[in-house]
């Protein structure tokens, strides 16, 4: 069993199983959705088996490495591997995608295409996290974009064409920078290779490393998203089906944070030391700007989308903190937001299914008719505003303390950034609790009075939210259950950065 290509299996199984969907006789989509759910569950079980029996979280090096020559002329290898940075996100992908498939249960129009695209996204997202060949990484990055575009275009709202076009333009332009920077890294020096392990060992001139860093940063800032490249996200979330939103918030945004750590931070350390303060400033802008913009949103999903932009600011600050505590907090924030974001978008979608509106002014008094939905929405909103005892609180606290204790920045800079972080933390509960008040409190609006009778959440909705809330509470109460998976890897990354920083300072002293 040890010799099986486990990573290849979990990457290819969803999309290969999805290719069988057209041959399944099913006009109403009922069989297809059970089939897709079964594929999702089976792949997630395989992931948990690999994690439980073949992954050693104490080992920071790559594990379960598979390396097959795919296109020899291009030096293109099917090279996969997992470590502490990728394993938690692979688990998150399997978990959230399976729940998103269950969340998409009401979808009946073009069900075969819909569930095939969901499974294709599943493969692409896992592929991004386990790829150890830069060209394969780019291929998986692109594979994941096409299903999102089609899911938006076919099952989106009234402005779906605009949202889908904006999404594909932003992400495609970002992808060009990945390709250009990746090719430059591969062809620099005497050895031509796309193997990330070999690319990490190459020594680049500082000016070239800075250019490479900027190229990758643009691409990953689009995906994260970071200000000012974030504007595609509210439009996409506002128009996408809520199961697609679960995948976008739960997994797709994490690809940007993961790639920043894997490539920019670990493979281009000299440039990262230069750009780290810039990342922190952008992170603070993310937190405050998105929180303030969220106040002006009338659409529930757009308001939640801006909260996602705000929360991703903490990831940038953690990555820029240059401390293990800060980086560990950034990874935990990605995991935490993946769960919380998916839950909020699912609840927004189920609320829309009943009220047929996402405009907060058209809601009101919904809590009386839908107390279970209200209770779940309140719980997930409290998780999003980082209530103590929930995962978001631990993640933000780790980032906060990690940056505050960093020896790489002056006291004045840390004081200003910490103060601004505090403002963002204060703004978050204001706009989230305001959203709850508008949608659920007060008397029932005239708009809803003229609609059909509201039906509260059923067993399916309660099951999905319970599955998402349990790990949110579990991590909040006992963070070690998550941090132990990746802590050895983040320590190694930060130690490598500190060695590079020490060498750089010695070189600067000698030159003076």
From Swiss-Prot:
Keyword Nucleotide-binding assigned: no
Report membrane topology: Multi-pass membrane protein
Query: Which one GO biological process term can you cite for this protein?
Result: ATP synthesis coupled electron transport
Q: Which InterPro entries match?
A: NADH_Q_OxRdtase_chain4, NADH_Q_OxRdtase_chainM/4, NADH_UbQ_OxRdtase, ND/Mrp_TM
What's in the GO CC field?
chloroplast thylakoid membrane
Sample GO molecular function, one term: ubiquinone binding
Q: List the disulfide bonds.
A: none
Cellular compartment(s): Plastid, Chloroplast thylakoid membrane
Name this polypeptide is given: NAD(P)H-quinone oxidoreductase chain 4, chloroplastic
Report the source organism: Chlorokybus atmophyticus (Soil alga)
Name the encoding gene, please. Answer: ndhD
